[in-house]
Amino acid sequence: MSKATGFIKEFRDFAVKGNAIDLAVGVIIGAAFGKIVDSLVKDVVMPLVNFILGGSVDFSNKFLVLSMPDGYTGPMTYADLTKAGANVLAWGNFITIIINFVLLAFVIFWMVKAIYFARRKEEAAPEAPAAPPEDVTVLREIRDLLKDKQGS
């Protein structure tokens, strides 16, 4: 067997067997789950937080201009300044991302706790004892008949 054929066989074994497929499925499901959690944070949790705090918890437009291009007279928004080549320290965006991360981690934590709680409930439910196999049932009937014959 040539080295190339051996390499191809080894790669095929790696890709088809083992954990590669499990990993691929996990990544795909993880990406989809990430979108669900991201939507939960952006569309449900953040509006509630903004309502409770009575304003907007969005610091993304907070920034510090470190240097301005010569002769710039345009709008003083982050997007316009960076487009014009200004050196801008976007500290507000960083704070917003940290807040979103903490909220996202909190939501994931509670979702995982709920899943574990549901699993524990399933495990705690006692299973009904399995019916004995047919041969055991027949043997018990024979035993009982023999006891009855010996007793009478």
From Swiss-Prot:
Disulphide bridges = none
Is the keyword Mitochondrion in the record?
no
Q: Does the keyword Transmembrane helix apply?
A: yes
The subcellular localization recorded is: Cell inner membrane
GO MF annotations, alphabetized: mechanosensitive monoatomic ion channel activity
User: Which GO terms of the cellular component aspect does the record hold?
Assistant: plasma membrane
Under InterPro entries, the record lists: MS_channel, MSC/AndL, MscL_channel
Where do transmembrane segments lie in this chain? 21-41, 44-64, 92-112
- Describe the protein's quaternary organization and the partners it interacts with: Homopentamer.
Write down the PANTHER family for this protein, in alphabetical order.
LARGE-CONDUCTANCE MECHANOSENSITIVE CHANNEL (PTHR30266:SF2), MECHANOSENSITIVE CHANNEL MSCL (PTHR30266)
Q: What does this protein do?
A: Channel that opens in response to stretch forces in the membrane lipid bilayer. May participate in the regulation of osmotic pressure changes within the cell.
Protein name as annotated: Large-conductance mechanosensitive channel
- Name the species this protein comes from: Bordetella pertussis (strain Tohama I / ATCC BAA-589 / NCTC 13251)
**Lineage of origin:** Bacteria, Pseudomonadati, Pseudomonadota, Betaproteobacteria, Burkholderiales
* Gene that specifies this protein: mscL
